[in-house]
């Protein structure tokens, strides 16, 4: 379980004080896939960095399995938007994936086993010996996902990971995330600016307000577990959920709801 309790983040410098996140509280249950959406610049990335121990909050706390997060916890992995910067171009794909595993007390044989399993999970076994620059953008992001999977995390934090790929690749990667979530039971917190993506991927959508960020709404996504790009996206219920989230984000832009967060079941 991932708990965010009264989280607050203030940036200070050059005589300015900017409150990015204000008294933010929510829970992500173990094995849940939750999407975070909100207006542009609302503090989604700041929140994710605080949750992952990459940025110290000004107030409040984040708990993973009941333990306070004060630095990057061993049970957590990240996938970022800029996959080109997270992969080392001079290292082969398999070596990129293995690199974080060297921090663990694992034999070389075990590391290779985890790398092979992760590559198979993202359908990139044949690319193990390639360099990242030889792969398409979508394939590079699959490598980044494989590296996170090989780490065997309890929680996977994903910060707009598909924003830089084309529409077809994005659809394929969305289906990959849903499949990996079902197969591995990982807790996933997925940040996106795309409303359709949030509704398609998530079992729950958390809508954030404009900065300073609070929870505008938590919405249960009551779509079937089995989803596909053709049928799910044209379903009447998908359209209803998408419209509802869109309306909430528009309200957030106007400043509505910040004093009275709501939950929709």
Model-derived features: positions:
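The feature captures the beta-strand-to-loop junction immediately N-terminal to the Walker
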Residues: 37-39
């Amino acid at each position: 379980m991932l708990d965010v309790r009264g989280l607050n983040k203030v940036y200070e410098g050059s005589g300015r004080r900017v409150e990015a996140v204000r008294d933010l509280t929510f829970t992500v249950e173990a094995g849940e896939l939750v999407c975070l959406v909100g207006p542009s610049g609302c503090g989604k990335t700041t929140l994710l960095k605080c949750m992952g121990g990459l940025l110290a909050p000004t107030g409040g706390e984040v708990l993973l399995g009941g333990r306070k997060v004060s630095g990057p916890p061993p049970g957590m992995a990240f996938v970022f938007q800029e996959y080109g910067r997270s992969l080392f171009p001079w290292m082969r794909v398999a070596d990129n994936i293995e690199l974080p595993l060297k921090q663990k007390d694992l034999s070389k044989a075990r590391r290779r086993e985890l790398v092979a399993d992760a590559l198979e999970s993202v359908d990139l076994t044949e690319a193990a010996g390639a360099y990242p620059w030889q792969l398409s953008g979508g394939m590079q992001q699959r490598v980044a996902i494989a590296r996170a999977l090989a780490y065997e995390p309890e929680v996977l934090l994903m910060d707009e990971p598909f924003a830089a790929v084309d529409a077809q690749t994005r659809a394929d990667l969305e289906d990959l995330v849903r499949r990996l979530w079902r197969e591995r039971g990982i807790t996933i917190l997925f940040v996106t600016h795309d409303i359709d993506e949030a509704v398609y991927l998530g079992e729950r959508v958390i809508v954030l307000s404009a900065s300073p960020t609070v929870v505008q709404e938590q919405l249960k996504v009551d779509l079937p577990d089995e989803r596909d790009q053709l049928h799910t996206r044209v379903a009447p219920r998908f359209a209803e959920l998408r419209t509802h989230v869109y309306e909430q984000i528009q309200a957030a832009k106007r400043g509505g709801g910040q004093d009275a967060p709501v939950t929709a079941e």
